[in-house]
From Swiss-Prot:
CC terms in the record's Gene Ontology section: cytoplasm
GO BP, one annotated term: L-histidine biosynthetic process
Active-site residue list: 12, 131
Organism lineage string: Bacteria, Pseudomonadati, Pseudomonadota, Gammaproteobacteria, Candidatus Pseudothioglobaceae
Keywords from the named record: Amino-acid biosynthesis, Cytoplasm, Histidine biosynthesis, Lyase
Catalytic activity, EC: 4.3.2.10
Protein name listed in UniProt: Imidazole glycerol phosphate synthase subunit HisF
Catalysed reactions, as listed in the record: 5-[(5-phospho-1-deoxy-D-ribulos-1-ylimino)methylamino]-1-(5-phospho-beta-D-ribosyl)imidazole-4-carboxamide + L-glutamine = D-erythro-1-(imidazol-4-yl)glycerol 3-phosphate + 5-amino-1-(5-phospho-beta-D-ribosyl)imidazole-4-carboxamide + L-glutamate + H(+)
Organism from which the protein derives: Vesicomyosocius okutanii subsp. Calyptogena okutanii (strain HA)
InterPro entries listed in its UniProt record: Aldolase_TIM (IPR013785), His_biosynth (IPR006062), HisF (IPR004651), IGPS_HisA/HisF (IPR050064), RibuloseP-bd_barrel (IPR011060)
Keyword Mitochondrion: no
Metabolic or biological pathway: Amino-acid biosynthesis; L-histidine biosynthesis; L-histidine from 5-phospho-alpha-D-ribose 1-diphosphate: step 5/9
Encoding gene, per UniProt annotation: hisF
Function: IGPS catalyzes the conversion of PRFAR and glutamine to IGP, AICAR and glutamate. The HisF subunit catalyzes the cyclization activity that produces IGP and AICAR from PRFAR using the ammonia provided by the HisH subunit.
Amino acid sequence: MSLAIRIIPCLDVCDGRVVKGTKFIDIKDAGDPVEVAKRYDLEGADEIIFLDITASIDGRDTMIHMVEAIAEQVFIPLTVGGGIRKAADVRAILNAGADKITINSAAIFNPNLINQLSKEFGSQCIVIAIDAKKIDYNKWGIFTHGGRKYTGIDAIEWAKKMTCGDNGAGEVLLTSMDCDGVKTGFDLLLTRAVSDAVDVPVIASGGVGNLEHLSEGVLQGAADAVLAASIFHFGEYTIQQAKKAMQENGIKVRL
């Protein structure tokens, strides 16, 4: 484990506010995106992920003005997703100050999109987002549109396909829909299966309820980064508390 493990707070944004739900529903307000992002930057987060969670459903573009406002306030890598369908969308978001973009639904409808974008912008700034749900023993399917539509695609095979070769995605954002917001920990079998299947970093997402869960994602799930929302948004823990807890478990982090 040579590289430091990243702790990444996630900003799910709906109607201009940071929100958090349970299994993609039961939404609660968690504040203004710019203020929340600024706080995480000051707390020592390694990155921030901004997801415009209704852009794909509404068929509209990502909130560029909000990306610009956040980028002006934070000095850590910013990944943006939601409503990205073509190269022009990526260019606009990167020009607004984002460092990376993440794509979910659009890649399902156009499997060559990741390859095209990686060629144009570099695979290091393209993240494939996978929302997976268990459909059988050791088998997970991919869902899109905020978890509303089942695609019939196997999550492990999709992760391999989207990251293979020189022009695959440079990172996987893996969310367990079964665990999202439930606070019982990551789906460690899913996380491990994807981490073992791909040669790029995997961000584990969905289910963090305490600091021990973050370490489990790394030590048992083999994740390269751990994402959380609820435990940070509502003041249960700080980023520094999370990092110190992981360090105590022998995990290399940036303090």
